[in-house]
């Protein structure tokens, strides 16, 4: 469990971030050899840690100094209790995290290769039972928030409705389109910012993103889908960003990769808090890149989320 005193920052003004998204337990193992079909390999260890993109981003935003409310669903089981306890320890408002006895808590099975790159299988469990409770909770919270973070880990009707309601209120909607599926394009018109990684950008556009030129081509397609700003997370390369009047690229800070799990969530959290604080698009991307770089230097998902002071120190 995190040492809250050392990772959370006290700000004169703390923006309020609403995260509506997935809450999972992570089962993580590493191996020197990714198995071929029909092949059995040996894992080096097994770690059971809290995760889920929504929960990871909530923790990341909290450590960046924001006040954070999380809306989602867990199972009424041992993993659910563990997930809830960790969120509480991180200072997250979990009054609208619902326990459901009809499904088990979501699980992510994560395989790390020798370079720290991850391969993930999700069993969404209770996340997929999110319904009108989550929609109503979001409607009550939205008038007071400075930004909304969403992903694609809950049922489409929930994520789409929450994004639409926030859009009507003029609240910045930051959309992380993962996991990728054909539902994503129904949410995009209600998002202000879409933040795919390279694989997700390729899924949405058909463009294989390997450099700034291909990122620019993919961004042009995404902008035509109705979103106003595109930020493509490009791992160790950095991030490309584009809006109607601005585009650019921010390089990642070189760092030894230990575990790439949740690096994108760290990026998204730092970026969203920066947008809520009215920083420029480029400055928000710079903070996102710094947070992502710091996250890959540690093992785990929520445990690797950096503190605000670490992010600021890295880019100063």
Where are these regions (language model features)?
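Conserved phosphate-binding/catalytic region of the ribokinase-like
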Residues: 2-17, 181-187, 212-316
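Conserved beta-alpha-beta core of the PfkB/ribokinase-like small-molecule kinase fold
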Residues: 147-217, 236-239
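Short gly/ser/thr-rich secondary-structure transition/capping motifs
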Residues: 2-4, 91, 128-133, 173-179
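Glycine-rich phosphate/adenosyl-contacting loop at the front of the ribokinase-like
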Residues: 1-73, 78-92, 257-258
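Conserved phosphate-binding/catalytic loop of the ribokinase/pfkB sugar-kinase fold
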Residues: 73, 95-100, 110-147, 152
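Beta-strand->loop->alpha-helix junctions that form or flank phosphate-binding loops
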Residues: 45-46, 71-76, 95-105, 176-178, ...
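Alpha-helix C-terminal capping segments
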Residues: 58-67, 112, 273-278
